[in-house]
Each structure stands twice: as C-alpha cells, then as structure tokens.
Design a protein with these regions (language model features):
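Tubulin/FtsZ superfamily GTPase core signature
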Residues: 1-166
Length: 166
C-alpha cells in the first residue's frame, strides 16, 4: 500500500487518510485516520471490481469524507484504477475536495496488460471521470514497471518496486 510505504519512509507534514470499502485492508493501513466507506452497502467487503459499487460506497459515506477534507489546503488522491473501490470512489472524493476549494491532485496507477481488457476499460472510465474533478493528475501505467525489472524479478519484488517508486 502506497500510504504505508510513505508512512514507513517518514514523510512529514502530511495527514494520511486511508479510505476503503474493505475492512481487512483498512486494518493493515498505518494511517492514523481511516474511513471505511459504504459499510451498509458492502458490509465491510470490497466492491468486487464494480466501480458503481465503489461510487455508491463513497456517496454513502460522503459526509464523513467531507468532514475529514475540511481545512485541508491540498489533497492527493491515490488509487489503483481498474478495480471497484478506487476506480469508483476517487472521483467522488475529488469532487468533494473541489467543492471545498481544495487544490486536488490525483495519483493513480493503470493495470498491467495481463490483467485484461475489462479491467483496463474500467480503469479508463474511472480515469476519465477523475480528470473532471482534479487540478492535475499523475498516471503511472503499471506496465512500465517491467522497464525497470529483470527476467528474474519475482511478482512480489515487482510489487515492492511499485510501492516504492516515487
């Protein structure tokens, strides 16, 4: 998780807020602030790669999201595009931040090609929606990780490269 990596690296002057539909994922987050979105909708489970569930979960928890955003000068929204929660909720959170006149930056990843065309279509759809609500966006295609990996790099090592790359 990118948030855990930034916390472990001692990033200062930042308040980290983990947002997820999945209760188990939130338990592993080192962020001091955590928001489990869509509790009534998902019952603490993930969004099942359904971006409409991710969006509905964020909508359900919008008041809580707005409360933690208030007072911020700048918000970075990090998400992996292509699944349900990040893809569906990122633009809802970004829209809320923009409505509060907060400078909003998206930092997202696109799926590996081997993850298939349907995941890439969801990612593209989520990315297009997110672009409407951020001041700027940084998009990192996961496929680019192969440029810095060797044939001997394991999937676990590749995941660590992914997390620790700026």
């Amino acid at each position: 998780n990118a948030i855990n990596e930034m916390i472990e690296n001692g990033m200062q002057g930042v308040e980290f807020i983990a947002v997820n539909t999945d209760a188990q994922d939130l338990k592993h987050s080192k962020a001091k602030s955590k928001i489990q979105i869509g509790l009534n909708l998902t019952k603490g489970l993930g969004a099942g790669a359904k971006l409409d569930i991710g969006q509905a979960a964020a909508d359900e928890s919008l008041n809580e999201i707005v409360n933690v955003l208030q007072g911020a000068n700048m918000v970075f929204i990090t998400a992996g595009m292509g699944g349900g929660t990040g893809t569906g909720s990122a633009h809802v959170i970004a829209r809320a931040a923009k409505e509060l006149n907060i400078l909003t930056v998206g930092v997202v990843t696109l799926p590996f090609l081997y993850e298939g065309p349907s995941r890439m279509r969801r990612a593209t759809q989520g990315l297009e929606e997110l672009r409407k609500h951020v001041d700027t966006i940084i998009v990192v295609p996961n496929q680019n990780l192969f440029k810095i990996a060797s044939e001997q790099t394991t999937f676990e090592e590749l995941s660590l490269i992914h997390i620790s790359e700026p």
